[in-house]
A protein has these predicted regions:
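Conserved PLP-dependent catalytic core of the aminotransferase class-I/II
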Residues: 40, 128, 132-168
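Residue-level signature of catalytic and energy-coupling elements of molecular machines
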Residues: 30, 59, 101, 134, ...
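Conserved active-site segment immediately N-terminal to the catalytic lysine
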Residues: 53, 73-92, 111, 115
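Conserved core segment of the aminotransferase class I/II
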Residues: 87-89, 96-145
Length: 168
């Protein structure tokens, strides 16, 4: 049946989409939406996906390093475990200031992607030295809560100024 969209963070619309479309379903969403900085209600979304046997894929490019305990991302920020997802993916280019990214999933999913993803098959892996740089960026990110606190302060200040200027 192809891909179907549902309204932004509207779980009732997603539930209707499940009912109106037969066949297997897969749900993909962002953890933190870049335009507004809002997040889906992940506990409810996970439950709805489980109820409809729909794997949930979370792109946490804007959540990793920014929200959650030690910058662990959207699921952590909402008190949930990443294990409730079929796939968790993010890039290293936002909070970590690097290139590349990752996709975390169960062994069956990873094996399938290894065998069928042209971008994976025909690409060069990140070098060990580069991976060490990413590891150190993650270590620094986890240890520096003050940076996440300052970011949230800056976001709040910007929103207040935008509202006062009649922009929001």
């Amino acid at each position: 049946n192809g891909f179907k969209r549902f309204l932004h963070n509207d779980l009732l619309a997603l539930e209707r989409a499940f009912c109106q479309n037969t066949g297997p379903h897969v749900v993909a969403t962002e953890g933190v939406f870049s335009m507004d900085g809002d997040s889906p209600p992940m506990a409810e979304l996970v439950a709805l996906c489980q109820q409809n046997q729909a794997p949930l894929l979370l792109d946490d490019a804007h959540g990793l390093g920014v929200v959650g305990h030690e910058g662990a991302g959207t699921m952590s920020s909402q008190g949930l475990e990443n294990a409730q997802l079929q796939c968790l993916m993010a890039n290293f280019g936002k909070a970590l200031g690097a290139q590349g990214g990752f996709l975390a999933a169960d062994a069956v999913t990873i094996d399938y992607l290894r065998q069928t993803s042209r971008h994976y098959i025909y690409s060069t892996a990140l070098s060990p030295g580069y991976c060490e740089g990413i590891r150190l960026a993650i270590k620094a990110c986890r240890a520096q809560q003050w940076r996440r606190d300052k970011l949230q302060d800056n976001i709040g200040s910007f929103r207040n100024m935008a509202q006062q200027a009649g922009i929001s």
